Structures are given as structure tokens and as C-alpha cells.
Regions:
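Acidic, mature catalytic/reactive cores of soluble proteins
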Residues: 1-307
């Protein structure tokens, strides 16, 4: 981690006494999923916890930093015991988290609206239930500047959507979240929601973060999902003439998700995760390194004939 980021993390405001934020234990990296739209990325754990995301850009300060021991997470998780799983929709970075519970099967489809806007991120989460009602706990606890600043100036409008400030960012949370409770979180606030989704129904959650005030209406979840599906279908070629085409398309989707509108491709979405334990090689990967960008280009050059 660079010194500036480390200092901000070390100066993070202490949590108020009595505030119990469920901090999930870390998992092996292979158990996490990546959501990315070209301008930023989010890392999702098997419990439905978003444990890493920088906003509004790859190299901005993290608003969810629990992956590296900081504060901030956005969790949509079953209330009762479950067995987790999940998969990417082919040729995209649309993730379907899946939990088998005693009552049925819960799915949470999630993505960053694609392609991304450099100033404004839209994080889509859609919960469905099969075989029985989905009972979930939802917690939105973003923390600006690697955990230093909690959500403030929080209010609810006539549509039931929430809006507030997060450091220098503007936040809006919509999708039938009017019943969410405001809880104290240090010197700011967090939102908690008990969610019950009947079998066959769907519940959308839409989180927006921007470095500019919201001048437009809140996001229509159904329209945003359609646009994201279409954009991924157009962005990832069939690659029918290569070996292991499905894997190749997924790799292509990952590289596209890491590539911004400027043409630069970040090495990875995260920072400071060691390559090996106590090896002293903890790099900030959220930048376009020439070596890391050149290697995929060399590997993908033969596939250009299949497009």
C-alpha cells in the first residue's frame, strides 16, 4: 500500500461503542467475484459482502475496504444457514451469487452498470427466491477515504430512496428501500434492511455514487440491467475459433472490465494484497502498468482474426 493510503487507513475514525458491524472473516481469493465496468471494480465475497470498491475511479480512495482490514462494506446475505455458490453469466462480469437454504434457493444477481461512467458508478443487485421466501439482511455501510469518513447528511425522499454524502461523494440508494433503518456508525450513519422476497418475486437494489450532484432521475433498474446485458454482448466477441472458447470469453470479459474509456488497463482492482506471505511485495495494482498491459496484448493478438 502506498504511504498516503496507509496513513488514511491508520487515521480511520474509531467505531462508536456499541456499534457492531458484522465483519466477515476473509476467504481465499478464489472465493471472491469481481464486478467491473471499465472505470472501477468491486470485489464480492461468498456471503454477499462487497469488501472492496474505490469510487469514482480505480485509483480513488476506497469506500469499501474491509478486504484489507479497513472499514466499509455492503452486504446482502441470507439470515439463516446456507451453502453458497455462484457463477458469471457467460461473456460478462454479471455475477449470480447463489445460496441454498433450508427454505429454498436465493440468488443475488449483481453487476456494475456497463459501460461505466467516469464520474458516476451504478451498482445493481437483484434478489430472487425459488422454492421458499428469501430472508436476507442488508447492510449499507460505505466509508470514504479508506474508512475515515462515514455516511452523513442522510435523508429519504418521497419515493423511498435514500440520499446522502460520503466524503466528497454523493450517494443515492433506491429500489424499495424505504423501510431501511438508520443506525449510528462512528460519527456518521449506516443503513440496515430486513428483506423478505417471496418465491418468484424480484427485489432490486441500486446504489449510485458520484463526484457530481445527481441532476438526473434515479436509475430504472430494469432498464439498467437490459443496457448492461446488451453492452456486454456487444463488447465480448464469440471467439469461436479458439481453444476453450468459454474460458477465453470470460478472460476477455475480465480484461474489458479492467480497461477504462481512456484505453488504459489496470493490473487489478485491489491494492496491497501480497503475492506471497511476508515477501514484502505488496503493490498497488490499481494503475496501468506497461508490463501488465503488454502481456495480455501479446496473448490476445492471435484472436483478432476470430472477431
Amino acid at each position: 500500500m502506498d504511504s498516503a493510503a496507509r496513513n488514511r487507513l491508520d487515521r480511520a475514525a474509531p467505531r462508536a461503542a456499541g456499534h457492531q458491524q458484522d465483519r466477515a472473516a476473509p476467504h481465499a481469493l478464489r472465493d471472491y467475484a469481481l464486478l467491473a465496468d471499465g472505470e472501477r471494480g468491486a470485489v464480492v465475497g461468498p456471503r454477499g459482502e462487497i469488501v472492496w470498491m474505490c469510487a469514482p475511479s480505480w485509483d480513488s480512495d476506497a469506500v469499501f475496504a474491509s478486504l484489507i482490514g479497513g472499514e466499509g462494506a455492503y452486504t446482502v446475505t441470507p439470515e439463516f444457514r446456507s451453502v453458497w455458490g455462484g457463477y458469471y453469466e457467460e461473456g460478462s462480469l454479471i455475477w449470480r451469487g447463489r445460496w441454498v437454504t433450508d427454505e429454498g434457493v436465493i440468488e443475488c444477481r449483481e453487476a456494475l452498470a456497463f459501460p461505466g461512467d467516469a464520474h458516476r458508478l451504478v451498482l445493481l443487485r437483484s434478489v430472487t427466491a425459488d422454492g421458499g421466501p428469501a430472508r436476507l439482511s442488508v447492510s449499507l455501510d460505505p466509508r470514504a477515504e479508506f474508512g475515515r469518513k462515514a455516511l452523513r447528511a442522510l435523508g429519504r425522499d418521497d419515493t423511498g430512496s435514500w440520499a446522502g454524502r460520503l466524503g466528497d461523494l454523493y450517494l443515492r440508494w433506491s429500489g424499495d428501500v424505504g423501510d431501511a433503518r438508520v443506525l449510528r456508525a462512528g460519527r456518521g450513519s449506516r443503513l440496515a434492511l430486513h428483506l423478505v422476497v417471496p418465491p418468484g418475486a424480484r427485489h432490486d437494489l441500486v446504489l449510485e455514487l458520484s463526484d457530481q450532484p445527481f441532476d438526473e432521475a434515479q436509475v430504472d433498474a430494469a432498464a439498467a440491467w437490459r443496457a448492461t446485458e446488451t453492452a456486454w454482448a456487444q463488447a465480448v466477441p464469440p471467439l469461436g475459433g479458439v481453444t476453450a472458447g468459454r474460458d477465453a470469453r470470460h478472460a476477455y470479459a475480465v480484461l474489458r472490465g479492467l480497461t477504462s474509456s481512456s484505453g488504459g488497463m489496470v493490473a487489478a482492482a485491489t491494492t496491497s494484497l501480497p503475492e506471497r506471505a511476508e515477501a514484502g511485495r505488496n503493490y498497488d495494482y490499481r494503475y496501468a502498468w506497461i508490463r501488465d498491459s503488454a502481456t495480455p496484448g501479446r496473448r490476445w493478438r492471435p484472436s483478432a482474426r476470430t472477431r
